[in-house]
Amino acid sequence: MEVERDQHISPPSLMAKTIPIIDLSNLDEELVAHAVVKGSEEWGIFHVVNHGIPMDLIQRLKDVGTQFFELPETEKKAVAKQDGSKDFEGYTTNLKYVKGEVWTENLFHRIWPPTCINFDYWPKNPPQYREVIEEYTKETKKLSERILGYLSEGLGLPSEALIQGLGGESTEYVMRINNYPPDPKPDLTLGVPEHTDIIGITIIITNEVPGLQIFKDDHWLDVHYIPSSITVNIGDQIMAEQWKVQECVA
Protein backbone atom coordinates (compact mmCIF):
# COMPACT_ATOMS: atom_id res chain seq x y z
CA MET A 1 0.00 0.00 0.00
CA GLU A 2 1.41 3.41 -0.92
CA VAL A 3 1.02 6.55 1.16
CA GLU A 4 1.57 10.21 0.37
CA ARG A 5 5.13 11.28 1.16
CA ASP A 6 6.22 14.59 2.61
CA GLN A 7 9.93 14.95 3.36
CA HIS A 8 9.88 16.54 6.81
CA ILE A 9 13.23 17.19 8.45
CA SER A 10 13.50 15.00 11.52
CA PRO A 11 13.82 16.95 14.79
CA PRO A 12 16.89 16.24 16.98
CA SER A 13 14.75 14.42 19.56
CA LEU A 14 13.60 11.92 16.92
CA MET A 15 16.96 11.62 15.18
CA ALA A 16 18.46 10.55 18.51
CA LYS A 17 16.24 7.48 18.48
CA THR A 18 17.52 4.39 16.74
CA ILE A 19 15.83 1.37 15.24
CA PRO A 20 15.91 -1.53 17.73
CA ILE A 21 18.75 -4.04 17.47
CA ILE A 22 17.74 -7.48 18.76
CA ASP A 23 20.32 -10.11 19.65
CA LEU A 24 18.86 -13.51 18.78
CA SER A 25 21.64 -15.31 20.66
CA ASN A 26 20.18 -14.16 24.00
CA LEU A 27 19.32 -17.27 26.01
CA ASP A 28 16.35 -15.51 27.61
CA GLU A 29 13.82 -16.28 24.87
CA GLU A 30 11.02 -14.53 26.74
CA LEU A 31 13.08 -11.34 26.66
CA VAL A 32 13.75 -11.80 22.94
CA ALA A 33 10.04 -12.36 22.26
CA HIS A 34 9.20 -9.18 24.18
CA ALA A 35 11.80 -7.22 22.18
CA VAL A 36 10.41 -8.53 18.88
CA VAL A 37 6.86 -7.50 19.81
CA LYS A 38 7.99 -4.11 21.11
CA GLY A 39 10.05 -3.45 17.98
CA SER A 40 7.12 -4.48 15.77
CA GLU A 41 4.56 -2.35 17.59
CA GLU A 42 6.66 0.77 18.09
CA TRP A 43 8.73 0.77 14.89
CA GLY A 44 7.44 -1.88 12.50
CA ILE A 45 11.08 -2.60 11.70
CA PHE A 46 14.16 -3.79 13.57
CA HIS A 47 17.64 -5.21 13.08
CA VAL A 48 18.61 -8.70 14.24
CA VAL A 49 22.17 -9.79 15.03
CA ASN A 50 23.48 -13.30 15.67
CA HIS A 51 20.65 -14.40 13.40
CA GLY A 52 22.19 -17.67 12.27
CA ILE A 53 22.58 -16.94 8.56
CA PRO A 54 26.29 -17.35 7.70
CA MET A 55 27.90 -14.11 6.60
CA ASP A 56 29.73 -15.87 3.78
CA LEU A 57 26.35 -16.97 2.40
CA ILE A 58 25.06 -13.40 2.60
CA GLN A 59 28.13 -12.22 0.71
CA ARG A 60 27.63 -14.89 -1.95
CA LEU A 61 24.01 -13.79 -2.25
CA LYS A 62 25.12 -10.20 -2.85
CA ASP A 63 27.75 -11.39 -5.32
CA VAL A 64 25.37 -13.37 -7.54
CA GLY A 65 22.95 -10.45 -7.54
CA THR A 66 25.68 -8.04 -8.60
CA GLN A 67 26.97 -10.45 -11.24
CA PHE A 68 23.49 -10.86 -12.71
CA PHE A 69 22.91 -7.12 -13.07
CA GLU A 70 26.33 -6.75 -14.72
CA LEU A 71 25.27 -9.11 -17.53
CA PRO A 72 24.40 -7.77 -20.99
CA GLU A 73 20.80 -6.66 -21.30
CA THR A 74 19.99 -9.53 -23.67
CA GLU A 75 21.00 -12.10 -21.04
CA LYS A 76 18.99 -10.40 -18.32
CA LYS A 77 15.95 -10.25 -20.56
CA ALA A 78 16.11 -14.04 -20.91
CA VAL A 79 14.36 -14.15 -17.52
CA ALA A 80 12.24 -11.04 -18.05
CA LYS A 81 8.66 -10.70 -16.91
CA GLN A 82 6.39 -11.61 -19.80
CA ASP A 83 4.56 -8.76 -21.52
CA GLY A 84 0.98 -8.58 -20.30
CA SER A 85 1.60 -11.02 -17.46
CA LYS A 86 -0.37 -10.36 -14.27
CA ASP A 87 2.24 -12.23 -12.26
CA PHE A 88 5.20 -10.44 -10.69
CA GLU A 89 8.00 -12.91 -11.49
CA GLY A 90 10.90 -12.05 -13.75
CA TYR A 91 13.42 -9.35 -14.51
CA THR A 92 12.11 -5.81 -14.86
CA THR A 93 13.91 -2.58 -15.58
CA ASN A 94 13.21 1.11 -15.69
CA LEU A 95 16.50 2.75 -16.61
CA LYS A 96 15.11 5.53 -18.77
CA TYR A 97 14.47 9.18 -18.16
CA VAL A 98 10.79 9.61 -17.45
CA LYS A 99 10.03 12.30 -14.90
CA GLY A 100 8.67 10.85 -11.68
CA GLU A 101 9.68 7.27 -12.50
CA VAL A 102 11.86 4.98 -10.39
CA TRP A 103 15.43 4.47 -11.66
CA THR A 104 15.91 0.79 -10.91
CA GLU A 105 16.08 -2.79 -12.15
CA ASN A 106 14.82 -5.83 -10.27
CA LEU A 107 14.77 -9.60 -10.31
CA PHE A 108 11.71 -11.13 -8.68
CA HIS A 109 10.82 -14.82 -8.31
CA ARG A 110 9.37 -17.37 -5.90
CA ILE A 111 11.75 -19.48 -3.82
CA TRP A 112 9.30 -21.52 -1.70
CA PRO A 113 7.38 -23.85 -1.65
CA PRO A 114 9.00 -26.05 -4.33
CA THR A 115 5.66 -26.60 -6.06
CA CYS A 116 5.40 -22.86 -6.78
CA ILE A 117 8.89 -22.37 -8.18
CA ASN A 118 9.24 -21.56 -11.87
CA PHE A 119 12.91 -21.95 -12.76
CA ASP A 120 12.31 -20.14 -16.05
CA TYR A 121 12.73 -16.96 -13.99
CA TRP A 122 15.92 -18.10 -12.27
CA PRO A 123 19.03 -16.86 -14.13
CA LYS A 124 21.40 -19.47 -15.52
CA ASN A 125 24.18 -16.91 -15.20
CA PRO A 126 26.01 -16.57 -12.95
CA PRO A 127 26.25 -20.41 -12.86
CA GLN A 128 26.16 -20.58 -9.05
CA TYR A 129 22.96 -18.52 -8.79
CA ARG A 130 20.59 -21.44 -8.17
CA GLU A 131 22.88 -23.09 -5.61
CA VAL A 132 23.24 -19.86 -3.62
CA ILE A 133 19.52 -19.03 -3.70
CA GLU A 134 18.48 -22.52 -2.62
CA GLU A 135 20.94 -22.43 0.28
CA TYR A 136 19.76 -18.95 1.27
CA THR A 137 16.12 -20.04 1.05
CA LYS A 138 16.65 -22.68 3.73
CA GLU A 139 18.31 -20.17 6.04
CA THR A 140 15.89 -17.30 5.54
CA LYS A 141 12.91 -19.64 6.01
CA LYS A 142 14.34 -20.77 9.36
CA LEU A 143 14.94 -17.17 10.42
CA SER A 144 11.47 -16.05 9.32
CA GLU A 145 9.80 -18.85 11.25
CA ARG A 146 11.94 -18.11 14.29
CA ILE A 147 10.90 -14.45 14.28
CA LEU A 148 7.25 -15.36 13.75
CA GLY A 149 7.54 -17.79 16.66
CA TYR A 150 8.91 -15.08 18.95
CA LEU A 151 6.20 -12.70 17.79
CA SER A 152 3.48 -15.28 18.47
CA GLU A 153 4.81 -16.03 21.95
CA GLY A 154 5.20 -12.34 22.74
CA LEU A 155 1.54 -11.85 21.87
CA GLY A 156 0.53 -14.68 24.18
CA LEU A 157 -0.16 -17.13 21.36
CA PRO A 158 1.23 -20.62 20.68
CA SER A 159 4.61 -20.33 18.95
CA GLU A 160 3.23 -21.80 15.70
CA ALA A 161 0.19 -19.50 15.56
CA LEU A 162 1.42 -16.88 13.09
CA ILE A 163 3.37 -19.41 11.04
CA GLN A 164 0.24 -21.49 10.54
CA GLY A 165 -1.90 -18.41 10.09
CA LEU A 166 0.23 -17.37 7.13
CA GLY A 167 -0.04 -20.80 5.53
CA GLY A 168 2.48 -23.06 7.27
CA GLU A 169 4.59 -25.03 4.79
CA SER A 170 2.46 -23.64 1.95
CA THR A 171 3.48 -20.05 2.70
CA GLU A 172 5.03 -18.45 -0.37
CA TYR A 173 8.52 -16.98 -0.04
CA VAL A 174 9.63 -14.55 -2.71
CA MET A 175 13.09 -13.28 -3.59
CA ARG A 176 13.48 -9.74 -4.84
CA ILE A 177 16.93 -8.47 -5.78
CA ASN A 178 17.10 -4.74 -6.45
CA ASN A 179 19.71 -2.71 -8.27
CA TYR A 180 19.76 1.08 -8.09
CA PRO A 181 22.63 2.16 -10.37
CA PRO A 182 23.99 5.71 -10.07
CA ASP A 183 21.66 8.09 -11.87
CA PRO A 184 23.41 10.87 -13.83
CA LYS A 185 20.15 12.88 -13.86
CA PRO A 186 18.65 12.37 -10.37
CA ASP A 187 16.32 15.35 -10.74
CA LEU A 188 14.38 13.43 -13.41
CA THR A 189 13.78 10.23 -11.46
CA LEU A 190 12.73 9.02 -8.02
CA GLY A 191 13.68 6.37 -5.56
CA VAL A 192 11.22 3.66 -4.59
CA PRO A 193 7.86 5.28 -3.70
CA GLU A 194 6.74 5.24 -0.08
CA HIS A 195 4.78 2.08 0.69
CA THR A 196 3.92 -0.58 3.23
CA ASP A 197 4.57 -4.27 2.60
CA ILE A 198 1.30 -6.19 2.23
CA ILE A 199 2.98 -9.50 3.12
CA GLY A 200 3.84 -11.02 6.52
CA ILE A 201 7.46 -10.05 7.05
CA THR A 202 10.31 -8.91 4.83
CA ILE A 203 13.88 -10.04 5.46
CA ILE A 204 16.12 -7.29 4.08
CA ILE A 205 19.79 -7.76 3.25
CA THR A 206 21.24 -4.26 3.10
CA ASN A 207 24.64 -2.78 2.30
CA GLU A 208 26.58 0.42 2.90
CA VAL A 209 24.62 2.40 0.31
CA PRO A 210 22.06 4.62 2.13
CA GLY A 211 18.50 5.19 1.00
CA LEU A 212 16.17 2.98 3.05
CA GLN A 213 13.87 5.07 5.23
CA ILE A 214 10.93 4.55 7.57
CA PHE A 215 8.09 6.89 8.51
CA LYS A 216 7.71 7.37 12.26
CA ASP A 217 6.04 10.10 14.30
CA ASP A 218 5.30 12.11 11.15
CA HIS A 219 8.93 12.15 10.01
CA TRP A 220 11.17 10.14 7.69
CA LEU A 221 14.16 8.46 9.33
CA ASP A 222 17.15 6.80 7.68
CA VAL A 223 17.65 3.09 8.34
CA HIS A 224 21.38 2.90 8.94
CA TYR A 225 23.44 -0.07 7.82
CA ILE A 226 24.55 -2.30 10.71
CA PRO A 227 27.32 -4.73 9.65
CA SER A 228 26.50 -8.41 10.24
CA SER A 229 22.84 -7.60 10.87
CA ILE A 230 19.66 -8.36 8.96
CA THR A 231 16.77 -5.92 8.84
CA VAL A 232 13.25 -7.23 9.48
CA ASN A 233 10.23 -5.26 8.28
CA ILE A 234 6.81 -6.18 9.64
CA GLY A 235 4.17 -6.29 6.91
CA ASP A 236 0.49 -5.43 6.86
CA GLN A 237 -0.67 -9.01 7.47
CA ILE A 238 1.23 -9.27 10.76
CA MET A 239 0.27 -5.76 11.85
CA ALA A 240 -3.39 -6.67 11.34
CA GLU A 241 -2.99 -9.82 13.44
CA GLN A 242 -1.31 -7.83 16.22
CA TRP A 243 -4.25 -5.43 16.36
CA LYS A 244 -6.72 -8.32 16.46
CA VAL A 245 -4.91 -9.90 19.41
CA GLN A 246 -4.69 -6.60 21.28
CA GLU A 247 -8.41 -5.94 20.76
CA CYS A 248 -9.28 -9.42 22.04
CA VAL A 249 -7.11 -8.96 25.13
CA ALA A 250 -8.60 -5.52 25.76
From Swiss-Prot:
GO BP annotation list: flavonoid biosynthetic process
Fe2OG dioxygenase domain: residues covered: 171-250
SUPFAM superfamilies: Clavaminate synthase-like
Keyword annotations of the record: Iron, Metal-binding
Binding site for Fe cation: 195, 197
Top-level taxonomic group: Eukaryota
A Pfam family annotated for this UniProt entry: DIOX_N
Keyword Transmembrane: no
GO molecular function: flavonol synthase activity; metal ion binding
Disulfide bonds: none
Family membership: Belongs to the iron/ascorbate-dependent oxidoreductase family.
Protein name: Putative inactive flavonol synthase 2
